[in-house]
């Protein structure tokens, strides 16, 4: 190997694993769910990785044990910041995600509202019609300025995530997933993986028990 080629090879290795190319492919401890733009300019700066269902999903978790304010958990995109601010026994959903070690990685967290929406858009489990009052997401890549249509997004092509698949999100009556984004002092945002409903305008009361699925970020 020439010196120039060897330098290129070493540089490639220093920047980590090859970038993911297919939604749902195994990647960095979980599965590739899409890109996010923390600046909201359609330029992706992180790959979003959803945790394996068997080790990174929890059920019957409260957002908080009381319906009171969480001033550090208001961002629609900063899941790591939201989640870290709630890493205690008063916040079972965030604490579950923050405590995970999967694939040697310890930086799992409860996704923010716009992060979990990307998971729904790219990894939609069912063929059920979408709601048309949710879907705007400035942090998606590309950004989406309009709500869903009945048929968009469609069911994912990632077979492990469709109904009955080993990685599929839970669907069915009242099967919401918590985000780490507070909607009001007493409520937090959720996502319903049957239809994409984010339960506007402010979500569900924090004391409710719903599902959680951890994610992590990998810099682009």
Give a label for each model feature.
Residues 1-15, 219-220:
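Short, intrinsically disordered N-terminal pre-domain segments
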Residues 3, 15, 67, 84, ...:
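Compositionally biased regions
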Residues 7, 64, 70, 78, ...:
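Compositionally biased, low-complexity segments enriched in small residues
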Residues 12-108, 175, 186-189, 200, ...:
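Extracellular adhesion/carbohydrate-recognition regions
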Residues 90, 113-220:
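C-terminal, surface-exposed recognition/capping segments
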